[in-house]
C-alpha cells in the first residue's frame, strides 16, 4: 500500500498489517496547485483512494518521467459522482532533480527510489493521497466502521447468491448510475436475467481490505463466482457511502478479471459445509427420522435405482420398518467440483439393529439450495 502526504511532500510504502507500519519513506513532488483536483488542467493532485492500473516502461520523456510510471484509476467512481474531470494521473519517476509541488497533478519521486520499490507496485495496489495523513495505523474510531463494512459485504454476497431482491437494496441507484455511466435499471435487468436463467449461483469473497477515503469507503476483495454456466474470479472494489438514513450503500464498483487464487479457500469452506451437512444427514438416518432424512434431498433426486422423494421414502420405510438402523459411519470424505455443484465421496459403514452390516463407497452430487445444499444424486458401491 502507498500513501502520499501532500503537505509534507512525502511518499510512504506501508505494510498492510495490524497495526499499519511504514516500510519506506521518500521525498516526492505533487501538483503545482494546492487543493483537491476537480477538473482537467487545474494542476492539482487528486485526494482519495486510488489503485495502480498498470506499468509503463518506455516511450516517456526521461526528464519528466524517467523511464517508469504507474497509472492510477483517476477519476474513480466517487470522483465521477462528484463531477471531477481529467485523467492521466500517475505515480512516476523523475529523471532530474525536483522541487516540491512541480508536477501537473501526478505524484513523482526520484527514479532510483521508484525503481527500488517497483516489484511491490502490482496492479491493484492501493494508493491513498491526502492533504495530510497519519501513517501510524488506523484510528480507533475507524475500526467499528471496518467491521460494519465487512458485515455489509458478506450480506451483499449472500443476497447475490440467493438471487434475492435484497441484493439491489445494497445500491444507491442514482449515485451508482453516475459512477458507472449506465442506468442502474440496465444493471438490474441484466442481473435479473441471470437470476432467472440459472438454477443456482455461488459468490465467495476473501482477502478483504477496507480503506477510508474522503467521505467514502472502499472494500477491495478477491471474488469467485460460480454458476452451472460459468466459473470466474477476479479482484473487485466496491465504493460505499451512507445514504440519508445513515445506511451503507454501494455507489460504485470496479472489477479486474483474473486469477484471484480463491479456489483453495472456496473448497475449504465448502468442505466444512459438506462436513456439517453429512453429520446431520447421518444422524437423521441413524435415528430413522424419515422427514428429517428426506429434507436433505432434491424432490427429483436419484438414489441408486430409485427416482424421486416418494420412491426414496417408500424404500426407507420398508427397510427401517423391518430392521431399524443401529449406526452409520462416514470416513475419509472428499469434495470436488461438479457441474451441478459438488461431488462428495466417502467410505460408509452401515449397521442395523439385527446385526446386519455393510461397507462401501458412497458418491453424492450436491446442488446449492439457498444457504445450504441438496442431494440430487446418490449411489453406493459395496467394497469387494
What annotation goes with each model-predicted range?
Residues 27-33, 91-94, 224-225, 251-263, ...:
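Short, solvent-exposed aromatic-acidic interface loops
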Residues 42-47, 56-154:
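Exported/periplasmic cell-wall-interacting domains
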Residues 1, 25-41, 46-56, 71, ...:
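N-terminal post-signal-peptidase region of extra-cytosolic proteins
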Amino acid at each position: 500500500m502507498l500513501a502520499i502526504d501532500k503537505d509534507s511532500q512525502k511518499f510512504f510504502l506501508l505494510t498492510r498489517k495490524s497495526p499499519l507500519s511504514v516500510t519506506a519513506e521518500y521525498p516526492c513532488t505533487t501538483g503545482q496547485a494546492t487543493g483537491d483536483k476537480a477538473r482537467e488542467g487545474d494542476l492539482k493532485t487528486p485526494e482519495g483512494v486510488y489503485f495502480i492500473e498498470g506499468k509503463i516502461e518506455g516511450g516517456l520523456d526521461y526528464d519528466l518521467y524517467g523511464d517508469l510510471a504507474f497509472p492510477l484509476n483517476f477519476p474513480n467512481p466517487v470522483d465521477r459522482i462528484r463531477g471531477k474531470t481529467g485523467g492521466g494521473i500517475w505515480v512516476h519517476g523523475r529523471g532530474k532533480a525536483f522541487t516540491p509541488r512541480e508536477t501537473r497533478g501526478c505524484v513523482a519521486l526520484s527514479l532510483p527510489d521508484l525503481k527500488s520499490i517497483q516489484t511491490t507496485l502490482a496492479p491493484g495496489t492501493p494508493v491513498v493521497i491526502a492533504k495530510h495523513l497519519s501513517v501510524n495505523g488506523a484510528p480507533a474510531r475507524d475500526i467499528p466502521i471496518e467491521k460494519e463494512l465487512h458485515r455489509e459485504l458478506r450480506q451483499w454476497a449472500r443476497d447475490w447468491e440467493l438471487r434475492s431482491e435484497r441484493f439491489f437494496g445494497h445500491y444507491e441507484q442514482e449515485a451508482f448510475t453516475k459512477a458507472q455511466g449506465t442506468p442502474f435499471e440496465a444493471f438490474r435487468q441484466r442481473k435479473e436475467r441471470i437470476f432467472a436463467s440459472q438454477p443456482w449461483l455461488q459468490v465467495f469473497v476473501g482477502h478483504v481490505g477496507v480503506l477510508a477515503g474522503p467521505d467514502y469507503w472502499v472494500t477491495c476483495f478477491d471474488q469467485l463466482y460460480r454458476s452451472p454456466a460459468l466459473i470466474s474470479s477476479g479482484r473487485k472494489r466496491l465504493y460505499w457511502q451512507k445514504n440519508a438514513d445513515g445506511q451503507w450503500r454501494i455507489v460504485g464498483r470496479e472489477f479486474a478479471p483474473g486469477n484471484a487464487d480463491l479456489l483453495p479457500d472456496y473448497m475449504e469452506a465448502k468442505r466444512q459445509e459438506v462436513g456439517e451437512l453429512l453429520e446431520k444427514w447421518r444422524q437423521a438416518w441413524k435415528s430413522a427420522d424419515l422427514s428429517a432424512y428426506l429434507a436433505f434431498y432434491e424432490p427429483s433426486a436419484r438414489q441408486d435405482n430409485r427416482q424421486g422423494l416418494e420412491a426414496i421414502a417408500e424404500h426407507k420405510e420398508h427397510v427401517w420398518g423391518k430392521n431399524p438402523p443401529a449406526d452409520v459411519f462416514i470416513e475419509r470424505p472428499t469434495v470436488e467440483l461438479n457441474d451441478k455443484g459438488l461431488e462428495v465421496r466417502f467410505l460408509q459403514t452401515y449397521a442395523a439393529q439385527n446385526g446386519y452390516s455393510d461397507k462401501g463407497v458412497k458418491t453424492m452430487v450436491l446442488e446449492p439450495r439457498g444457504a445450504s445444499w441438496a442431494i440430487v444424486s446418490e449411489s453406493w458401491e459395496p467394497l469387494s
